[in-house]
A protein has these predicted regions:
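Short beta-edge/loop segments at beta->alpha junctions of small alpha/beta modules
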Residues: 1-75, 111
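Generic structural marker for isolated residues within well-ordered, non-membrane alpha-helices
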Residues: 18, 80, 184
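Short coil/loop linkers at secondary-structure junctions
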Residues: 27-28, 90, 194
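Amphipathic alpha-helical interface surfaces
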Residues: 31, 76-80, 144-148
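Hydrophobic alpha-helix position signal
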Residues: 38, 83-84, 188
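Short gly/ser-rich loop at a beta-strand->alpha-helix junction or flexible surface loop bordering the NTP-binding
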Residues: 46-55, 65-124
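Short small-residue beta-strand/loop micro-motif enriched in glycine and branched aliphatics
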Residues: 62-63, 126-128
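Hydrophobic alpha-helical interaction segments
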Residues: 128-214
Length: 214
C-alpha cells in the first residue's frame, strides 16, 4: 500500500489500529512492517504497540487526549486528577491523563502525552458517563463525585480521618458545592473500605462547611 492510499483511508480516523489497516490479500506482518517504516519516517506516530495516529501535518481530525485514553487501554474511564481539573474541583488542569480501570495498573508515555491507569476492583468500576469532547469525539469520564472518591481511595494513605484542612491546604479543592453527599457515600461504599468511608464523610463535612461559609 502506498502512503497516499493509506492516508486517504485513515485521514478522518482519530486513532489507527493496525488490525483495521490490513488489506485483503496482505499479511498482518506486512502491514505492521509498513507501519513501522512510516513511523520511522515521521508520517505516523506510535502510541503503543499496534496503535497510531497520523502526524500533525496530515491529520484532519483534532487530537482528543481523553478520547485516546479510553481507546489505548480498557475498559477504562478518565478520573482522578484529570477529571477533578475537568470539573473545576481543583484549580489546575492536569497534563497527564489519569484514568481508572478494572484491569491492572498501566502507564503509557508517547508523543500525545502520558496516560496513567489505576486499578479498582470490578464492583467499584462504575459512576462514569459518556461526554462529547473536542472534535465531537466521545469519551467516558467519572461523575464529579466518583472522581473525588476514586482520588480519595487511590491516595488513601495520605489522608487522616480527623484532618479536614488537608482538602483545601494540600489539594486545594474548590467549587465543592456542586457535589452531592449521598452520591459520595454511595460510591465510597462500593470499595468496602472503612477508612475510605470515614475520609469520604470528612470530605462531605468539609464541603458543607465551605457551603455554609460561602
Amino acid at each position: 500500500m502506498k502512503y497516499s492510499d493509506f492516508k486517504k483511508k485513515v485521514v478522518d480516523w482519530p486513532i489507527i489500529f493496525s488490525r483495521d489497516v490490513v488489506s485483503r490479500g496482505k499479511s498482518g506482518q506486512a502491514v505492521r512492517n509498513q507501519l513501522e517504516r512510516w513511523k520511522k519516517s515521521g508520517r505516523i506516530i506510535r502510541l503503543k504497540k499496534g496503535v497510531f495516529i497520523l502526524a500533525d501535518d496530515d491529520r484532519r481530525v483534532g487530537l482528543s487526549r481523553p478520547y485516546l485514553a479510553n481507546q489505548l487501554y480498557g475498559p477504562s474511564y478518565v478520573s482522578l486528577e484529570y477529571a477533578l481539573g475537568y470539573y473545576g474541583l481543583i484549580p489546575e488542569r492536569v497534563s497527564d491523563i489519569t484514568s481508572v480501570t478494572s484491569l491492572k495498573t498501566m502507564k503509557f508515555a508517547n508523543a500525545a502525552g502520558t496516560f496513567i491507569y489505576q486499578h479498582v476492583k470490578l464492583k467499584a468500576y462504575r459512576g462514569f458517563v459518556l461526554v462529547e469532547g473536542d472534535g465531537g469525539l466521545k469519551f467516558f469520564i467519572a461523575e464529579p463525585e466518583k472522581a473525588v472518591v476514586d482520588f480519595l481511595y487511590l491516595n488513601l494513605e495520605k489522608f487522616k480521618v480527623d484532618d479536614p484542612d488537608i482538602f483545601e491546604g494540600s489539594y486545594r479543592f474548590q467549587n465543592t458545592e456542586k457535589l452531592g453527599a449521598k452520591k459520595i457515600f454511595r460510591f465510597a461504599d462500593l470499595f468496602e473500605n472503612r477508612k475510605l468511608v470515614k475520609v469520604a464523610s470528612l470530605f462531605s463535612k468539609y464541603c458543607s462547611l465551605k457551603l455554609g461559609g460561602a
